[in-house]
Amino acid sequence: MEKVALAEAFDSFDEQWSPRLAGELNGQAVKLAKAEGEFVWHHHEDADELFLVVSGELTIELREDSDIVLQEGEFVIVPRGVEHRPVTDSEAEILLFEPSETRNTGNVESERTKTDLEQLD
């Protein structure tokens, strides 16, 4: 068992939209990511996805519903199959919780797709 200090973990990398694996439990992954600008529209066919904003502000744009704006300390769970796009005007630090095999771009293959996540030290 090792504790994770979120501030130190986020300070250990700078790359945007490139999740880092912070831990795993019961087939679920805890991922940390820095975000700025627009991500890709995508959905996850078989997995719900939790977005928790640690710092900054993040908007989850939705094709078929109203966008959800998350402030620091707020989270939302995007149900499986719901097309969404995370967007932020300035850098946000986010924690993601989802099944370990979930690909960051879901059903979309792009230059931002990450298949082998870097483990935090």
Regions found by a protein language model. Name each.
Residues 34-35, 44-63, 97:
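Short, conserved beta-strand element in jelly-roll/cupin
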